[in-house]
């Protein structure tokens, strides 16, 4: 792949030296297709030819088979999801290094190379908490990202800033707040999970949350981890929520022209 990239660069440079750079697109695309053909061949020999369909078995809570059917990726999406994933969801970020109430775009941070840059509304943690509670109360889980390694106790499956008393252990004060930790790359969005539950007290305030991780059922409790609300405030960075759970004043912010941030911005650079 890198060899092919160099070949394309050399061809582009050569076309410029001949004064024909504007006519080089077709030739460059031809080289790109040749390179990708070789890449596809290598991957197929090593991993197998990508299947055009797959078999999926649905089971109930007692592991009893309900149905087994064949799908293509598109037919599976149409049957089990069939939602407007492009226009119905909003990314909400808590980045204290940037002004709240503004919309930001991260250059080249995308799900796929030729897709769209990630765009998010930057909000105080209190506003994000409101949206998350509303969504979970309606039994709707959310994409969620955080700095998962901080104050994590794997044995207890608990994320809690009170898990470890580093100040007493080392006799050193740790005074950086969330903003300073992001600015110095001491903290950032490092891992994504699914936010699936919240516990609220008699006043409707969240005191703990639950996420489902992607590390398998042997990690955490059946694959799930609990975090305190204090940890949520300090180390949670973003959620993606449906518009129906987001207040109108936040949705109005999407009318702004996004402020473009570089791909090496501290908020995204450390990400897995």
Question: Where are these predicted regions, by residue range?
Answer:
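Residue-level marker of positions within ordered structural domains that often coincide
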Residues: 1, 6, 137, 149, ...
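Glycine-centered flexibility motif
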Residues: 4-6, 11, 48, 157, ...
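Helix N-terminus capping/helix-initiation residues
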Residues: 72, 124, 177, 228, ...
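Core regions of eukaryotic protease modules
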Residues: 4-137, 148
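Catalytic nucleophile-His microenvironment captured as a short glycine-rich beta-strand/loop
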Residues: 1, 183-216
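Generic recognition of cysteine residues
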Residues: 46, 143-146, 224
């Amino acid at each position: 792949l890198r060899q092919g990239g160099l070949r394309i660069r050399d061809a582009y440079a050569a076309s410029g030296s001949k004064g024909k750079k504007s006519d080089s697109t077709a030739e460059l695309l031809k080289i790109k297709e040749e390179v990708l053909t070789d890449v596809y061949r290598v991957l197929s020999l090593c991993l197998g030819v990508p299947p055009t369909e797959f078999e999926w078995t649905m089971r109930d809570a007692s592991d009893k088979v309900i149905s087994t059917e064949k799908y293509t990726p598109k037919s599976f999406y149409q049957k089990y999801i069939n939602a407007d994933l492009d226009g119905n969801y909003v990314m909400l970020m808590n980045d204290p290094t940037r002004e709240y109430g503004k919309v930001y775009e991260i250059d080249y941070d995308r799900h796929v190379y030729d897709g769209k840059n990630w765009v998010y509304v930057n909000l105080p943690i209190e506003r994000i908490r409101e949206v998350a509670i509303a969504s979970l109360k309606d039994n709707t889980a959310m994409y969620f990202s955080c700095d998962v390694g901080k104050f994590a106790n794997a044995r207890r499956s608990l994320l809690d800033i009170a898990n470890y008393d580093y100040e007493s252990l080392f006799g050193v004060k740790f005074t950086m707040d969330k903003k300073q930790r992001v600015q110095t790359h001491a903290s950032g969005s490092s891992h994504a999970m699914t936010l699936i539950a919240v516990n609220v007290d008699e006043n409707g305030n969240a005191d703990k949350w639950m996420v489902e991780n992607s590390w398998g059922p042997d990690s955490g409790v059946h694959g799930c981890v609990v975090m305190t609300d204090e940890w949520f405030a300090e180390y949670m960075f973003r959620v993606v929520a449906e518009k129906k759970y987001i207040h109108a004043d936040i949705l109005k912010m999407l009318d702004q022209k996004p402020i473009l941030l570089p791909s090496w911005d501290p908020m995204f650079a450390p990400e897995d």
